[in-house]
Amino acid sequence: METYLQTVRDEWIQLINETDSLVHQLTAQLASDHASGLITEFYRVVLADPHVAEFLTTEQVERQLQEALRRWLVDVLSCRVEQVDEQIRAQQRAADVHARIGISVDLVEMGFRILKKLLLPLINATPHPSETKLSIYHYAINSIDLAMEVMSRAY
C-alpha cells in the first residue's frame, strides 16, 4: 500500500480505536436508522444545483444512486477496524465510477459537505447528553472526511 494510503489507513484505525465503543455504536445506529431519509434530503438539495442536474436525472437517482449512497453512508459510519482496508478500496472504486461518468471532484466534495451538514440536526435531535452528541458528530465527520480524502486522492 502506498505511503499516503497507509497513513490514511492508520488514521482511520486510530479514529475507530480512540472512539468510545458506545459512540461508535450510536453513530452506526444513527446511520442505519436515518440513512434513507438523509439520502432523500441529500438528493433533493443536490439536484437543485443546475451543475449537478447536467450529470444526474431524478430517474438515475431513484433507480441506482439512492441505495448505493445509503449503503455507503451506513458502511462508512459503522466501519470497524477489520473493515478499514475494504473501505479504502470502496472509496477508490467510488472515485473511479464518479470520474468515469464525468462527475468532478468538486461536485463530490459538495455532496460530502451537504451530507455532513444534514447530519448535525439528526444528532442534535437525539436524547443523548451534549458531550455524547459532540462525540458522535466528531466521529461521523472524521469518518466521512477520511473516506472523502481517499476518494479525492483516487481521482
Model-derived regions, located:
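Structured interaction and signal-relay segments at domain junctions
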Residues: 42-78
